[in-house]
Amino acid sequence: SEESNLCDLLRDYDKPAQEVIAEMTDGGVDR
């Protein structure tokens, strides 16, 4: 599924997942 692919991508990513998500969602999960 797309969601598990995203998790794999984040696992390989250099930045913390939250930072990546914040960039992709243009603001982040906490706002």
From Swiss-Prot:
Which cofactors does the annotated protein need, by name?
A: Zn(2+)
Give the cofactor binding note.
Binds 2 Zn(2+) ions per subunit.
The first-level EC class reads oxidoreductase
Q: Name one GO cellular component term.
A: cytoplasm
> Which GO molecular function terms does the record list?
alcohol dehydrogenase (NAD+) activity; metal ion binding
Quote the subunit structure annotation: Homodimer.
Q: Where does Zn(2+) bind?
A: C7
**For this UniProt entry, what is the primary localization, expressed as one broad class?**
cytoplasm
Which catalytic reaction applies to this protein? Answer: a primary alcohol + NAD(+) = an aldehyde + NADH + H(+); a secondary alcohol + NAD(+) = a ketone + NADH + H(+)
Q: Where in the cell is the protein located?
A: Cytoplasm
Q: Which family does the UniProt entry place this protein in?
A: Belongs to the zinc-containing alcohol dehydrogenase family. Class-P subfamily.
* Keyword flag Zinc: yes
Q: From which organism does this entry originate?
A: Catharanthus roseus (Madagascar periwinkle)
User: Keywords, A to Z?
Assistant: Cytoplasm, Metal-binding, NAD, Oxidoreductase, Zinc
Its Enzyme Commission number(s) read 1.1.1.1
Protein name in the entry: Alcohol dehydrogenase 1
Sections of the chain in a coiled coil: none
